[in-house]
């Protein structure tokens, strides 16, 4: 059932995946549903809704990624990082979260599904000082873009960018962009079966 729905959703948004990648995505939903009962990893309880609200909501960002090394900040159970890592085996994803139960879940996913391009790190973002900086900083966890830029400003390379996954955009929030940052792209995302606004903002640092 989920496999057929995933095929339809991928076709609807013009994304391609191998049979192995599709199996990994469906198995990820299965693991999320199983662990969620004990560890409360997401408020979404229904696997079909997980496929839409977590898997597809993450994957629609994939065509807009530039670079090869990314960090997903406040990743929770691995969203959007794990679905994006499955679809982009040539890119590297660091998944950052401060809660141990989420990191344990991610590591179990990595082990059971054989995902080799993710690293899970338990840390608060302000305490995390990476040896190598990132092409892209991803997050759908922050309440505001201002918060994201404040807490994550030290993570991208000089020519890297921030990818803020947002729902409805507020003009007030957009007008309060911190000094030294500029929005280069505002992309409306279409998620199958989701009648809610979704946007991706790309933000860069300016000297």
Swiss-Prot record:
Protein location: Cytoplasm
Enzyme Commission number(s) from the entry: 2.1.1.170
Keyword terms, alphabetized: Cytoplasm, Methyltransferase, rRNA processing, S-adenosyl-L-methionine, Transferase
A GO term from the CC aspect: cytosol
Domain of life: Bacteria
Reaction catalyzed: guanosine(527) in 16S rRNA + S-adenosyl-L-methionine = N(7)-methylguanosine(527) in 16S rRNA + S-adenosyl-L-homocysteine
InterPro entries: rRNA_ssu_MeTfrase_G, SAM-dependent_MTases_sf
Enzyme kind, highest EC tier: transferase
Pfam families xrefs: GidB
Major place of residence: cytoplasm
Residues binding S-adenosyl-L-methionine: 74, 79, 125-126, 140
GO molecular function term, any single one: rRNA (guanine-N7-)-methyltransferase activity
HAMAP family recorded: 16SrRNA_methyltr_G
Alphabetical list of NCBIfam families matching this protein: rsmG_gidB
The family this protein is said to belong to: Belongs to the methyltransferase superfamily. RNA methyltransferase RsmG family.
Function summary: Specifically methylates the N7 position of guanine in position 527 of 16S rRNA.
The protein's name in its UniProt record: Ribosomal RNA small subunit methyltransferase G
Lineage: Bacteria, Pseudomonadati, Pseudomonadota, Gammaproteobacteria, Alteromonadales
Gene of this entry: rsmG
